[in-house]
Regions:
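Bacterial Sec-type N-terminal signal peptides, specifically the leucine/valine-rich hydrophobic h-region
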Residues: 15-18
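Flavin (primarily FAD) cofactor-binding/catalytic cores of flavoenzymes
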Residues: 12
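Compositionally biased, proline/threonine/alanine/serine-rich low-complexity intrinsically disordered stretches
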Residues: 26-46
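Bacterial N-terminal signal peptides that target proteins for export
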Residues: 1-8
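Bacterial signal peptide processing site
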Residues: 21-25
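Mature extracytoplasmic or organellar-lumen-exposed domains after removal of signal/transit peptides
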Residues: 42-212
Length: 212
């Protein structure tokens, strides 16, 4: 049976024309026979095909909607798997939560391309996908741990403490809530302080990355 501190469980729980120009004809050339009239009129050079443009926009919107829908669905599945792990912590539920995390990352990573077309996404993206992170903000780390230079919260260890101190500020972390965790992102002005999102959950499920 896997035993987990209540703080760890709480933190883990809270935790998308080429326009061709023909050569001029020789005006002295012999006249050619007139071609039969047709019902199709070629669009003027540079003209926009409104129907085609609308079709492209609709297709793009459909793709975006599908990707974000998949991302939301798999995130909810991840939440369910994490809840099951917290309720019954063992190897099976842990592995199921890890598998759900991996599955949830696929559509979310696909959604990253759409950030460049909608700046609103950047308002919350950091709460979901910020990286890299100093794991010592969240929990204990190996002695070989190296953190971002000048990060005052690099070894704060939210899970092991009811209060953390960053510089002259003392922060109550006795009760871990979504709002509290969100407020700890970029703590002390360091982008390496990440308390929410996929990578914080990844650390809680797999532990510290010692391969880098």
């Amino acid at each position: 049976m896997i035993r987990m501190p209540l703080a760890t469980a709480s933190l883990l729980a809270i935790a998308i024309s080429l326009a061709g120009c023909g050569d001029d004809k020789d005006k002295a050339a012999a006249p050619q026979a007139a071609a039969p009239a047709t019902s199709t009129v070629a669009p003027a050079a540079g003209a926009v095909d409104e129907a085609a443009a609308k079709a492209v926009v609709k297709h793009y919107a459909d793709i975006v909607f599908a990707v974000y829908s998949d991302s939301l669905s798999t995130a909810k599945t991840l939440q369910t798997a994490v809840d099951a792990f917290l309720a019954t912590p063992n190897d099976d539920t842990l592995n199921a939560a890890k598998a759900a995390w991996v599955a949830a990352r696929v559509p979310y990573l696909q959604s990253e391309v759409f950030r460049f077309g909608n700046t609103i996404i950047d308002d919350w993206e950091g709460q979901v996908n910020a990286w890299p992170l100093d794991e010592g903000l969240i929990d204990y780390v190996d002695k070989s741990y190296e953190h971002a230079l000048g990060n005052p919260g690099a070894t704060a260890n939210i899970i092991a403490n009811t209060q953390i101190q960053v510089g002259e500020d003392k922060i109550d972390v006795k009760d871990i809530t979504p709002e509290k965790l969100a407020s700890l992102n970029e703590l002390g002005g360091s982008e390496a302080n990440v308390a929410t999102g996929y990578h914080a959950i990844e650390f809680l499920l797999w532990g510290q990355d010692l391969n880098g």
